Amino acid sequence: MSSTPSSRHVLRLAAGAADAVALSLSPWTAGVRVGAQQQSGKQALLTGVHRPADAPEVLRTGQRRGHDASMLPYMPGHIVVKFSPAVSPQSMSAMAADIGGRASASLHHADFVYVDIPADADPVAAAAAMARMPGVIYAEPDGRVFPTFHPNDPLYQYQWNFQKIGMERTWDINRGGKSAIIVAVIDTGVAFQDKGNFAQAPELKGVQFVSPYDFVWDDQEPVDLDGHGTHITGTIAQATNNSAGVAGMAFNVSIMPIKALYTDWDQELNAPFPYGASTVARAVRYAADNGAKVINLSLGSSLPNTATRDALEYAIGKGAFIAIAAGNDGETGSPLLYPAVYAKDLDGAVAVAAVDFALNRASYSNANDYVEIAAPGGDTQADLNDDGYGDGVVQQTLDFDAVHSGVFNQFIYYFAEGTSMATAHVSGLAALLMDQGITSPKAVERSIEMFATDVGARGRDNETGYGVINPRATIRGLGLRR
């Protein structure tokens, strides 16, 4: 762990290229709190003495990092297996034992089981051996998942992203949606509550949170140990027109905070479920079963995952529209990113590319045939609007320097870039459409694509799909006025 706390942490969170949620944290230096936290994990933080949120108006710009090619693309110690309904639990156990593994008990919101294997065993070989057995529908390594983080509000002047897509005029038609519309943010968690050593982000005060869940810890406390999920939530629903900070697109909708990404802090605190893409699959099913109308997936994995694809189909069938980040590896050949790849074959799910201040594809944004739409993702290397800051997407989130030291109640306004940020814009627009009465996921996708502003090559292209979202044109074009 040779990187310095400030540079390594800030670089990673802003970029989110293909970081596999790796913060590379150095040993904790938080004094006497270290011992208690190491002994009791997350629960010690939740039951500690509450400290009020500290949110100075600090504006900070992040930088991008490249993909960490040294990290294995899958989680060790287990594989994901779906058996035929005819296979009994006893047979599952026997088949798992044949490869030196052990089948787990059934988990909620999962149509598969985990087969635990030795930590030094090869998950690819184990999955291949399992897949050859009769009664196995699929067996796969569990792909490592990473975030693709690459009004009168006083800092609204810095939100060029909302100004570029005409949000002020859109709010003239729809003032931020309604609480009946639930947007699930499946991510690193959200700073959604004041409890113990955790604090709610001040800009999320007034946001209604429903059905929270943490699949990494198997509890109802999806606190953010990273900052990515809080930043994403801000773009979607941050308090707006409140004479404070910045704005959110659909600021009256409800947020369902779901933690599915395993971070280094979770590892340090000995989280009981260190899984990958399969956890995202469970989270998607949970969101759909609990009434989410929009699901935001600002994340990705380099490996395909059948469980996640099945979960996307399930959620769309339950009436949820899904926005998925297209990926931040555009400068290294735009390799396939999952589950974004699946979007092109699913009506009701879209893969989202990122554009910069000039509405051109951001250099890091993946260009591929699965890209369907684009939205502001930013470019922190440029300052085309001459405001003195890199052209990232600014929202309030955890202070990364504080997080590095195990402090989760300090907040800053942070300029980030990535298809993560772009995806949150599409989720916000989808929520407004749902509020206006366009409730079919397929219709939401068609509406967003139909009224997008075409940029780049004429018609659909691999860089920006059907173009950059145009919220006002989408709502007005459908005759939806209030």
What does each of the following model-derived ranges do?
Residues 25-156, 171-173:
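Primarily auto-inhibitory N-terminal propeptides
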Residues 187, 320, 341-435:
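Extracellular S/T/G-rich loop segment that most often corresponds to the catalytic His/Ser-adjacent loop
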Residues 9-21:
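Sec-dependent N-terminal signal peptides
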Residues 136, 152-290, 294, 384-411, ...:
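Active-site core segment of subtilase-fold serine proteases
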Residues 79-82, 104-106, 113-114, 138-140, ...:
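Structural recognition of the beta-strand scaffold that forms the well-ordered cores
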Residues 1-9:
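N-terminal secretory signal peptides that target proteins for export/translocation
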Residues 283-285, 290-297, 306, 318-320, ...:
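C-terminal subdomain of the subtilisin-like protease fold in secreted/lumenal serine endopeptidases
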Residues 304-321, 338, 342, 348:
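Catalytic-core regions built around general acid/base machinery
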